[in-house]
């Protein structure tokens, strides 16, 4: 692509398609600390039964290996907060994100429309299934910060949203990360129904227990 798109142009178009948050990060290998933590997490079986998270590690740690010519990563978020709470049936309830149409299809369609509307013809659309550290790039793109719930928190939106990315082959103006605003709050830990989250006195770098989540 020869035409340089501005950061603001990208955001306006993304929000017109229903993405309530959008930011852009430069495509590089993830920092060494993150890469080391991810490998250690896998080594300690932190991913539980999610074996796919141990696949394509090189691509997960460097999006330039996932998409040749990658220069920028456009990160977007789509809200999935339900209009009403799902009633419990016995001990179980359907997770809110699983209600309705398959979100992969909906978001992929929106990503392709975003690319088309912006005149981008060389890109890779990612939504959940691609080997990319979505939360890491969302932080780099200034969407939010990683909270004590180990999820991305977007200001005024919490953590109930889907993340998706367009990896593109052009540079633009990049957003800056947001400083964590959790402070002394640990409401997520107190309200975790399965105990998957660590207590606030524990090492914050220890991931939550995926097998309990």
Predicted segments, located by residue:
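Auxiliary alpha/beta "docking" domains used to position bulky ligands
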Residues: 1-181
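Iron-sulfur cluster-binding cysteine motifs and their immediate structural context
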Residues: 187-212
């Amino acid at each position: 692509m020869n035409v340089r798109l501005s950061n603001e142009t990208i955001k306006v178009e993304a929000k017109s398609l229903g993405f309530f948050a959008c930011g852009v990060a430069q495509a590089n290998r993830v920092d060494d600390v993150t890469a080391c933590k991810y490998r250690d997490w896998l080594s300690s079986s932190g991913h539980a039964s999610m074996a796919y998270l141990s696949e394509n590690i090189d691509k997960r740690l460097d999006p330039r290996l996932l998409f040749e010519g990658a220069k920028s990563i456009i990160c977007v978020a789509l809200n999935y907060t339900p209009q009403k709470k799902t009633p419990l049936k016995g001990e179980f309830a359907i997770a809110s994100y699983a209600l309705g149409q398959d979100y992969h299809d909906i978001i992929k369609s929106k990503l392709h429309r975003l690319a088309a509307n912006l005149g981008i013809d060389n890109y890779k659309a990612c939504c959940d299934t691609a080997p990319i550290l979505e939360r890491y790039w969302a932080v780099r793109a200034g969407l939010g910060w990683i909270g004590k719930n180990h999820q991305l928190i977007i200001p005024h939106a919490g953590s109930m949203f889907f993340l998706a990315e367009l990896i593109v082959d052009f540079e633009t103006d990049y957003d800056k990360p947001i400083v964590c605003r959790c402070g002394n709050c640990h409401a997520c830990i107190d309200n975790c129904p399965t105990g998957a989250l660590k207590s606030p006195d524990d090492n914050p770098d220890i991931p939550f227990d995926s097998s309990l989540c």
